[in-house]
């Protein structure tokens, strides 16, 4: 079953047939008559509409579009629903969509004669439901008393045990709100608290702190339909659903005329057993409070935002310092705030301990035949009635015991040897919980993820690995969820559990004694195996030369092919950013050609975007496929100055690519041919001087984004613009990494002098390039811009991307930003006002390998008027 939504395949085909003026009864036969089915991609059916419109505009015959739609729907189903699950030799199609011979033929094109259509395909679901009902009733007589019986009958029939389970589950919410009254004394100022994100953890602290200082505290009600309406009306960017709901909650506080709104900025969050440098909240937690408060213009309404920056990696002292920093804004002496903070900290500790105690008590009282469902998600997803989609109540009403991740001792597990670079504390907790559930024979997971959440796209793969063969229910939350769809999935999952035998706990069973499978991704390649690098445009040759200079047999993978991307996408299940299936598919395609042991370079970052997890998740996918011959080499980008075998040579390799991109396209091949595989300083400076002598012509477009999108995954957009005579001012990769290294100076202090030397080299080469240079003349100004707009931010090198776009906009006719579609960091830059900060018009290229004529039309229209 799809974890996201009802398939809607039949209704979608019907809708598109109507748009194209094709009678539905004729659609399938028309598709069968196609000679060249249109390539419409394999995205969610809703997004295929754009591809259909583009194909029609290009004059593609209706028959080819109809056939392309059939293939696209089938491929989307196979990749998003079937995924990597094993498919047997006998495949039966069922469902009303089988009336369409085009869809049937598309399935047969994928699986051949293994596919057969059920003779009762249109009613097979109803027949199966009837069989399940018959099985459930058995020999007992029916208790059905009619559809018009009072609703109270269902309530009265609820067993005492079910009611106890419901009461138990609700205790956690009661504990969170303990001591909260919501009353407002008109003589006091009021602090409004939106019931969102980490407030579901820190509310006891906030309530005790502000109440002790003499303020009224008002917590917004749990998310309602009105909250959703406000959020949809006010949200200015396409964020994940939990962040979008902040708009509605803040607006409700504005309507209540509070004096302050309290929502902390979560930069880092401590996890007891973690060994990563920093444990980050996601990129939204680092920026949402300030971004949304600005979007709603709360200051003009007389409301002050209280958003202390929580750097909890540095312990309670750092949190205390952040909260005490509010004393000046509130006009209250620090000693009074310190006393109030003590009350708040104690409230959080009491709540955490009480919830874990609850869980231990329940697990200790389980009967041998009890199956307990564990709701796995972040704390705000557990409590919010919209984000949990009413699932806890649906499970409880069906007689199951339900607990949450907080009831399990996940914080006590040390999984660092298995997940060395898992910098999301909630991710560490989720995977710890997965281990406990997989280990306990009678615990089963209900795993809720969020649509549009970058971290969830990676964690879902690791969660799947942890659960192994044990069944679990995963549902993705978004604002369009259907109650019927949720209930259908729950019923199917519970039915499968009912057919699983209950296992007796082994004697002396210890829940925390789980398997840890160490997984180390080396930063340095071995010399015994070839090393394959992902293609990176003009940087590829010099980076290959860098590794060869270290004695490594290095090669570059081919440019991304449709086949390689298809292999990678077959292993995706959500909205993974484009570089993930591209990198994975490149490895799988190369292993098809040569399955011999080989190394593949997939760099890591220290957070907080999803890209830092690519290497670990690709390793998990390869392990699940039984592919041990593919070894990953994963250096940490932030610490390369301290760990690279020859940092001078590495920086020269980066500069070589930057110099080639600065040159007019017609000069590049000649310059590269004159170089050694890894050019020396003299060769670099000579080339820069040569380029600087050439006149710079054409309109100037600045391009800023992620490295792969700027080089390999832009669908040929940038090379086309260059071929048409435009000059592209590409953000230099050497400067981008230099900025990242300076941003992490605590790890790179021994390299401080070297970093200054490299800054001087960039300045010199920039001067030599003249009008072709894209290096910043004043690197300090880059940091000043970043510190003003994104002072506490880690993820996707977003600080540099923001500052560089602003800097380049002063010497360009337009700014083009390139990022994978759905990338959270790109959304953050938009929310933080990048478009307004730039001195030239800005166009966002949101890339997912589906650039088409419609996209070109939008871009060309923008460039014409800018």
Question: What are the residue ranges of the model-derived segments?
Answer:
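A short glycine/serine-rich beta->alpha loop
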Residues: 2-3, 38, 60, 114-120
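Adenine-nucleotide phosphate-binding core of ATP-dependent small-molecule kinases
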Residues: 50-79, 794, 798
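Hydrophobic helices that insert into or interface with lipid environments
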Residues: 116, 120-127, 135
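An N-terminal assembly and electron-transfer interface module characteristic of large anaerobic redox
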Residues: 2-14, 20-22, 132-866
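Glycine-rich phosphate-binding/catalytic subdomain of phosphoryl-transfer
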Residues: 1-50
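Glycine-rich phosphate-binding loops at beta-strand->alpha-helix junctions
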Residues: 72, 81, 86-110, 121-122, ...
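Beta-strand segments within the central parallel beta-sheet cores of soluble alpha/beta enzyme folds
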Residues: 26-33, 68, 89-94, 117, ...
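Acidic-glycine-rich active-site phosphate/pyrophosphate-binding loop
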Residues: 1, 43-50, 97-112
């Amino acid at each position: 079953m799809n974890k996201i939504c009802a398939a809607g395949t039949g209704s979608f085909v019907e809708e598109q047939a109507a748009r194209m003026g094709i009678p539905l009864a004729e659609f399938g036969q028309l598709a069968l008559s196609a000679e060249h089915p249109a390539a419409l991609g394999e995205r969610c059916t809703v997004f295929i509409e754009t591809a259909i419109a583009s194909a029609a505009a290009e004059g593609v015959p209706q028959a080819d579009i109809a056939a392309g739609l059939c293939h696209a729907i089938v491929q989307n189903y196979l990749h998003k629903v079937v995924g990597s699950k094993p498919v047997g030799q006998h495949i039966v199609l069922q469902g009303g969509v089988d009336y369409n011979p085009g869809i049937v033929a598309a399935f047969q094109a994928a699986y051949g004669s293994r596919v057969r259509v059920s003779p009762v395909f249109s009613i097979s679901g109803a027949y199966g439901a009837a069989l399940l009902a018959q099985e459930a009733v058995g020999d007992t007589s029916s208790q059905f008393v009619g559809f018009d019986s009072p609703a109270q009958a269902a309530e009265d029939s609820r067993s005492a045990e079910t009611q106890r389970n419901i009461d138990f589950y609700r205790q956690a919410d009661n504990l969170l709100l303990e001591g909260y009254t919501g009353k407002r004394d008109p003589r006091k100022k009021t602090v409004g608290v939106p019931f969102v994100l980490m407030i579901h953890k820190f509310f006891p602290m906030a309530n005790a702190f502000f109440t002790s200082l003499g303020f009224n505290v008002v917590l917004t009600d749990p998310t309602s339909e009105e909250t959703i309406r406000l959020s949809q009306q006010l949200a200015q960017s396409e964020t994940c659903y939990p962040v979008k709901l902040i708009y509605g909650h803040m607006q409700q506080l504005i309507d209540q005329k509070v004096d302050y709104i309290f929502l902390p900025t979560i930069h880092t969050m401590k996890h007891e057993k973690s060994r990563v440098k920093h444990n980050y909240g996601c990129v939204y937690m680092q920026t949402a409070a300030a971004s949304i408060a600005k979007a709603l213009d709360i200051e003009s309404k007389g409301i002050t935002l209280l958003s202390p920056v929580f750097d909890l990696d540095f312990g309670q002292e750092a949190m205390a310092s952040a909260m005490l920093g509010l004393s000046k804004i509130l006009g209250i002496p620090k000693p009074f705030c310190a006393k109030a903070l003590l009350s708040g900290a104690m409230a959080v500790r009491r709540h955490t301990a009480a919830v874990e105690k609850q869980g231990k008590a329940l697990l200790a009282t389980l009967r041998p035949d009890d199956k307990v469902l564990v709701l796995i998600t972040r704390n705000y997803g557990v409590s919010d009635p919209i984000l949990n989609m009413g699932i806890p109540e649906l499970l409880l009403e069906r007689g199951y015991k339900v607990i949450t991740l907080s009831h399990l001792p996940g914080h006590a597990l040390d999984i660092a040897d298995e997940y060395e670079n898992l910098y999301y504390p909630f991710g560490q907790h989720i995977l710890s919980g997965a281990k406990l559930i997989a280990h306990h024979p009678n615990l089963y997971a209900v795993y809720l993820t969020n649509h549009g959440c970058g971290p969830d796209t990676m964690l879902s793969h690791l969660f799947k690995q942890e659960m192994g063969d044990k069944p679990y229910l995963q549902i993705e939350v978004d604002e369009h969820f259907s109650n019927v769809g949720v209930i259908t999935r729950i019923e199917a999952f519970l039915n499968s559990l009912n057919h699983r035998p209950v296992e007796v706990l082994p004697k002396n069973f210890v829940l925390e004694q789980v398997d840890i499978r160490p997984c180390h991704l080396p930063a340095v390649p071995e010399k015994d195996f070839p090393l394959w690098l992902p293609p990176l445009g003009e940087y590829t040759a010099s980076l290959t030369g860098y590794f060869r200079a270290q004695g490594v047999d290095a090669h570059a993978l081919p440019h991304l092919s449709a086949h390689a991307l298809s292999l990678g996408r077959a292993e995706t299940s959500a909205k993974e950013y484009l570089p993930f299936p591209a990198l994975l598919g490149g490895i799988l395609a190369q292993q098809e050609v040569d399955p011999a042991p080989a190394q593949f370079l997939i760099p890591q970052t220290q957070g907080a975007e999803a890209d830092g997890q690519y290497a670990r998740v690709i390793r998990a996918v390869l392990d699940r496929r039984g592919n041990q011959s593919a070894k990953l080499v994963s250096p940490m980008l932030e610490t390369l100055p301290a760990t690279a075998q020859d940092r001078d040579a590495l920086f020269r390799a980066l500069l070589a690519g930057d110099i080639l991109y600065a040159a007019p396209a017609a000069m590049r091949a000649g310059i590269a041919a004159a170089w050694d595989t890894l050019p020396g300083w003299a060769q670099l400076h000579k080339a820069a001087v040569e380029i600087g002598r050439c006149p710079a012509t054409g309109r100037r477009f600045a391009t800023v984004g992620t490295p792969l999108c700027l080089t390999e995954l832009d669908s040929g957009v940038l090379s086309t613009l260059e071929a048409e005579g435009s000059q592209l001012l590409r953000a230099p990769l050497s400067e981008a990494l230099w900025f990242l290294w300076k941003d992490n100076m605590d790890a790179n202090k021994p390299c401080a002098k070297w970093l200054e030397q490299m800054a001087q080299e960039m300045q010199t080469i920039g001067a030599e390039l003249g009008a072709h240079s894209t290096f910043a003349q004043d690197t300090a100004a880059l940091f000043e811009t970043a510190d003003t707009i994104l002072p506490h931010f880690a993820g996707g090198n977003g600080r540099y991307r923001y500052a560089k776009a602003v800097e380049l906009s002063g010497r360009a006719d337009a700014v083009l930003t390139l990022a994978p579609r759905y990338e959270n960091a790109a959304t953050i830059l938009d929310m933080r006002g990048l478009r307004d900060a730039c001195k030239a018009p800005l166009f966002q290229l949101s890339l997912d390998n589906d650039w088409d004529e419609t996209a070109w039309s939008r871009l060309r229209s923008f460039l014409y008027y800018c």
